[in-house]
């Protein structure tokens, strides 16, 4: 009888809790989906900005066609 109670407890209480999707997980998934839609150039800009680095040298940044710093 005790074994049946343990099995019922696992399937009726623990299993639904383990499969429950938390609300806090959803914005992170939505943010990750939005990041996948970015082009490679946009991703590179975000990563370089976060790292604090530049994709070109200082003398090239004065050029009007520079898309890195502009």
Swiss-Prot record:
Give one GO molecular function term: toxin activity
Q: What keywords are annotated for this sequence in UniProt?
A: Amidation, Bromination, Disulfide bond, Neurotoxin, Secreted, Signal, Toxin
What residues bear 6'-bromotryptophan in this entry?
58
Which segments are removed on maturation as propeptide?
Answer: 25-44
Q: List the disulfide bonds.
A: 55-68, 56-66, 61-69
Keyword Signal set for record: yes
Notes concerning its domains: The cysteine framework is III (CC-C-C-CC). Classified in the M-1 branch, since 1 residue stands between the fourth and the fifth cysteine residues.
Report what the protein is called: Conotoxin elongated-tx3a-a
Q: Which organism is it from?
A: Conus textile (Cloth-of-gold cone)
